Swiss-Prot record:
Binding sites annotated in the UniProt record for substrate: 41
Catalytic activities: (7R,8S)-7,8-diammoniononanoate + CO2 + ATP = (4R,5S)-dethiobiotin + ADP + phosphate + 3 H(+)
SUPFAM superfamilies: P-loop containing nucleoside triphosphate hydrolases
Coarse class of the protein's main subcellular location: cytoplasm
Protein name as it appears in the record: ATP-dependent dethiobiotin synthetase BioD
Family label: Belongs to the dethiobiotin synthetase family.
NCBIfam families in alphabetical order: bioD (TIGR00347)
Binding sites annotated in the UniProt record for Mg(2+): 16, 54, 115
The keyword Iron belongs to this UniProt entry's keyword annotation: no
Cofactor section: Mg(2+)
Gene3D superfamilies (alphabetical): P-loop containing nucleotide triphosphate hydrolases
GO cellular component annotations of the record: cytosol
């Protein structure tokens, strides 16, 4: 199977935006792309329905076929760590179900983009005083990681800590995507520092869009993705998709 697990250095680094752009760009190149977000917290209500808004955005933007509730089997309204949100709602995050859903999806698509819920060290569930962490799920379904980061103050520390955590727990971190790039004077210095310390390829720099997510202008997004996920970037990214 061919898939990549997208995680972030922190909350609000734009994983969903990157996943949407990556799925769209690969579809534009003619690839059959699937999307999977096993767990989502902070879901929004639309009437009586709880909507996995990240999944809905990616599926609609990239024109991916699939039921959003199948693509995101565990959805919680509370904007909290999954193990807390699940406990509050008395729901068990069934890891076997996640694995089975991923296996089923992988039969239908050439490549699958998996979006994590936060970073590597996020607890997904707690059972008998034992935590099951996101990095454990990654190792069990697709040890093939792309890290999304930014260039904001503090990102060098966050990125290096994430990379060292990945190494310590045997994760295969194959590339870094820098989001919210503004082409300001010190940004490339930050990116070069990260590249030198980690020796991990910088797969792409994705331009900052000021209006996201309040203004969903598809043409604006597509212009950014055409530029940032050009043929050279796509070739580097395609080398990651191998579980």
């Amino acid at each position: 199977m061919k898939a990549a697990y997208i995680v972030g250095t922190d909350t609000d680094v734009g994983k969903t935006f990157i996943c949407a752009g990556l799925c769209w760009a690969l579809k534009e190149k003619g690839y059959n792309i699937g999307y999977f977000k096993p767990v989502l917290s902070g879901a929004k209500r639309r009437g009586k329905m709880l909507i996995p808004q990240d999944t809905e955005f990616v599926v609609n933007f990239a024109k991916i076929e699939g039921d959003i509730y199948r693509l995101t089997p565990f959805i919680f309204e509370k904007p909290a760590s999954p193990h807390i949100a699940a406990s509050d709602e008395n729901i068990d995050i069934n890891v076997y179900q996640i694995k089975q859903t991923f296996e089923d999806l992988s039969q239908n698509y050439e490549f699958v983009v998996i979006e994590g819920c936060g970073g590597l060290a996020v607890p997904l569930k707690e059972e008998k005083n034992q935590f099951y962490m996101q990095y454990q799920l990654i190792k069990e379904i697709c040890n093939n990681v792309i890290l999304v980061t930014t260039t904001k103050l503090g990102t060098i520390n966050h990125t290096l800590l994430t990379v060292e955590f990945a190494k310590a727990y045997g994760l295969c971190l194959k590339g870094i995507i820098v989001n919210m790039y503004k082409n300001e004077p010190d940004e490339d210095k930050v990116i070069n520092t990260i590249a030198k310390f980690t020796n991990i390829p910088i797969l792409a720099k994705v331009d900052f869009i000021n209006d996201f997510p309040s203004d969903v202008d598809e043409n604006k997004f597509k212009n950014v993705f055409k530029k940032c996920f050009d043929d050279r970037a796509i070739m580097k990214i395609m080398g990651v998709f191998e579980c």
